Design a protein with these regions (language model features):
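Beta-strand-rich modules
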Residues: 481-502
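Recognizes extended acidic, P/S/T-rich segments that occur
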Residues: 447-486
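Substrate-binding cleft of secreted/luminal carbohydrate-active enzymes
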Residues: 265-269, 273-292, 306-418
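Polysaccharide-binding and catalytic clefts of secreted carbohydrate-active enzymes
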Residues: 52-53, 60, 101, 124, ...
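C-terminal outer-membrane/trafficking sorting elements
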Residues: 451-457, 485, 512-579
Length: 579
């Protein structure tokens, strides 16, 4: 991959899957509520230190809830017993703590799973007792029947409850649709009721899933359109060449691997084409050295092209446990990474050697995958989603990415197909002691980026095109700036909407707040032109409202006229309307 991304992008998606099912990551059911809160804060502190900007928290692992649901019982993974109130609202707490640390929180939903082991939810569970016809029985589990229209209506209500009551930044589904073990005739009853005569059963099952996705997306747009909707399906799409051609995409022959399309009846390309998701995060869980056609080197470029064709974002999901142990031939590299001599290494037990080598090779594979995600991105929206959060820390990837790949904060990518929200003016910027604070007339979806910028370049829009001076992202209107007190620098604050659109910078100078305006610059819009008055020769930067540089014009001191089409612009940080 060479030097493709020596300087990291200002915008990319950085997240982990935070699993609650079976208490994989969080919470631990043996902990008290206060201990669970403290554990989550520790996780989020670690993610912030690694400069992550999102977390996917599993809040509905098994037709249950890690939030105050109007429809489903409290999850057993909170207290050890299904239906027992944990004494606090985990989702509300998690949103507040994530936003304090500049991270989006997407509520991770498993839509269909009811029980991973038969009868674990009990005979008196509401769904089993009141709607047994909603359940499909498999060899060792039950799922909600994707082919039952009442199930679709119910799931839309469940998710609307979350979207309505909580300030989540997104809803994300995982890879569980029809089960991996395959579906033979378990849904025969639903077929007899709902499958059109002559309809291919595979097409019918895929349409059931497609309808749920479409209905969820429509509900979100109607209820709270600032909430993003994405899915993390199995990484191998698996459709045929004829289906690929009908979608207008390149066919990737992955025969021999599990097919999401024909085994899980999960068609991620269909959702992208229908524009019923905002992002897709296929679980590309095969490492770079995998020689099969579905290895990381093959899947990631293919998904990037598909996402580009459909004008949606692709954030690759990466499995940490497949970042394996090192080989003897690479031991020198291992020792270098561990900072050990060969004698020190030889003094370790076999278990310690295994752990050490796994961590060293894991960082190498992690670095390769991050670089590949960036180099193959075609939307200006690279993304990295690590599974799982516990291993993100235990493998030392948090330290590795902070020191090598995520050395600066990053904003989440702009979703250009969304209508930008109105961004507030930022006023009353002040510093009191160690606290920088400001005011803004904005709702709870708006977040803020804080830059610490050399005063000599603070008024140049190009200064804000990279993350070089980006220090914090927060939903709050104050931060501790005790680490940013160097003389000759100023604070600049921008407002950012849910889709990633960023305002002009508002700069705190010794004389007050200025809206990215150079002293002495006067700029205003007229009929078909932008008019500027400057005290000396100056570069004028004209940007679209979505942040695209349209023109750079060098003007002489005095008055100048710059002809442009009608529209809204940002000129050296000032909003300008041209008729």
């Amino acid at each position: 991959l060479g030097d493709v991304y020596k300087r990291q992008p200002k915008r990319e998606f950085r997240a982990t899957w935070l699993a609650s099912v079976s208490n994989i990551d969080w919470p631990k059911s043996t902990q008290t509520s206060e201990e669970q809160k403290a554990a989550l804060i520790k996780i989020f502190d670690g993610m912030q230190a690694a400069r992550m900007n999102a977390v996917w928290l599993q809040v509905r692992p098994m037709s249950d809830a890690l939030y105050n649901s109007a429809y489903e019982p409290w999850s057993k993974f909170l207290t050890g017993t299904r239906g027992v109130d944990p004494g606090y609202d985990p989702l509300a707490f998690a949103i507040e703590e994530a936003h304090k640390r500049g991270m989006e929180l997407h509520a991770w939903i498993n839509p269909y799973r009811y029980e991973s082991e038969k009868n674990m939810n009990g005979a008196d569970d509401s769904i089993r007792k009141n709607h047994p016809e909603w359940l499909l029985e498999y060899s060792s589990s039950f799922i909600l029947d994707p082919g039952n229209p009442e199930v679709i209506e119910y799931l839309v209500k469940v998710i609307k409850d979350i979207v309505t009551k909580y300030n989540v930044d997104g809803i994300v589904f995982d890879d569980y649709f029809y089960p991996y073990e395959g579906t033979k005739n378990e849904d025969a009853y639903s077929q007899s009721l709902y499958k059109p005569e002559g309809k291919n059963v595979g097409d019918w099952r895929r349409e059931n899933c497609n309808k749920l996705i479409a209905d969820i997306y429509a509900m979100i747009q109607e209820t709270k359109p600032t909430v993003k909707f994405g899915i993390g399906p199995f990484g191998i799409w698996g459709g045929s060449s004829s289906v690929a051609a009908s979608y207008g995409i390149e066919y990737l022959n992955t025969s021999g691997g599990t097919s999401a399309y024909s085994q899980l009846y999960c068609d991620g390309v269909a959702w992208l084409k229908a524009k019923t998701i905002d992002y897709i995060s296929p679980q590309c869980y095969w490492p770079s050295f995998n020689t099969h056609v579905w290895g990381y080197k093959t899947l990631v470029p293919w998904w990037a092209k598909v996402a580009k064709t459909m004008d949606r974002h692709f954030y690759s999901s990466m499995r940490i446990s497949t970042m394996p142990q090192n080989s003897p031939q690479r031991m020198k590299s291992v020792l270098r990474r561990l900072g050990m001599s060969e004698n020190e290494y030889n003094g370790l037990s076999m278990v310690e050697r295994s752990i050490a080598a796994t961590a060293a090779k894991g960082t190498e594979e992690c670095g390769f995958e991050v670089d590949m995600n960036r180099s193959t991105d075609l939307m200006g929206a690279p993304g990295h989603v690590f599974f799982n959060t516990t291993q993100f820390f235990s493998y030392g990837l948090d330290t590795y990415v902070a020191e090598n790949k995520f050395t600066e904060p990053a904003l989440t990518p702009v979703m250009s197909w969304k209508t930008p929200c109105d961004l507030p003016d930022i006023t009353d910027i002040s510093v009191s002691g160690n606290m920088l604070s400001w005011s803004a007339d904005a709702d709870e979806t708006i977040r803020y980026a804080v830059y610490f910028v050399p005063s000599r370049v603070a008024n140049n829009p190009q200064t804000y095109e990279t993350s070089a001076y980006l220090k914090r992202i927060t939903w709050e209107k104050s931060i501790d700036v005790s680490s940013y007190t160097q003389s000759g620098y100023v604070y600049a604050i921008t407002a950012i909407d849910s889709y990633g659109n960023e305002s002009q910078p508002y700069i705190k100078t010794p004389s007050g707040v200025q809206s990215g305006i150079v002293d002495g610059l006067v700029v205003y819009g007229g009929s078909g032109a932008i008019y500027v008055s400057v005290p000396k020769d100056m570069d004028i930067y004209i940007y679209s409202f979505t942040g695209q540089l349209i023109r750079m014009v060098r003007v002489s001191g005095g008055n100048s006229e710059i002809t442009v089409p009608a529209g809204m612009y940002i000129v050296n940080g000032t909003k300008v309307a041209v008729q």
